[in-house]
Amino acid sequence: PAVKVSTEPSPEEKLYASMLPSTAKIMFIDSLVVDRDSFLTKIPLNKESGEIMSYNKFFNKAKKTSVMMSVYINEFGDQAYYAEEDTVRGNKLYRLDWLGEKWGKRTKVEGIDSAFHQINYPFVLSDGITLFFSAKGANSVGGYDIFTTTFDSDSGKFYEPQNYGFPFNSTANDYFLAIDEY
């Protein structure tokens, strides 16, 4: 008797084919391979996803901070998010708005409380309301973890940040998450 060979994909193959377009290309930048001072320059982003640079470069500071601090500038170049080092109260996140020909006064990012320590590496999705940052403290798996929150336009504050979870966080330090949607 002849064996009948099915050309119809199995349910598993159909599921795989339907899920494949949703996969993301993930790049890990290992701190053992890339040194601290050039870390931010190794993150490839399309212009539509904004720009990342060191705090010292953005603010034209010659003196290095004790910790590498970063600034995220949105795709339109009219908003910047950054953490500022505060050894007494812990780092805080701030936002600047471009007003005509210069940056306006800094505004503290509201909604991220003192449960987060050594906040750093902000990144805002192109939707303009989803913020990622790195911090130690509340709900950390180990060392620095990636947290995410969204902006509530009614209250003018961000919602309570949530740990972004595995596989983006680990028991080691996880510093930065940038999502290039383009």
Task: Please name every model-derived segment.
Residues 2-182:
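Short, conserved micro-motifs composed of acidic
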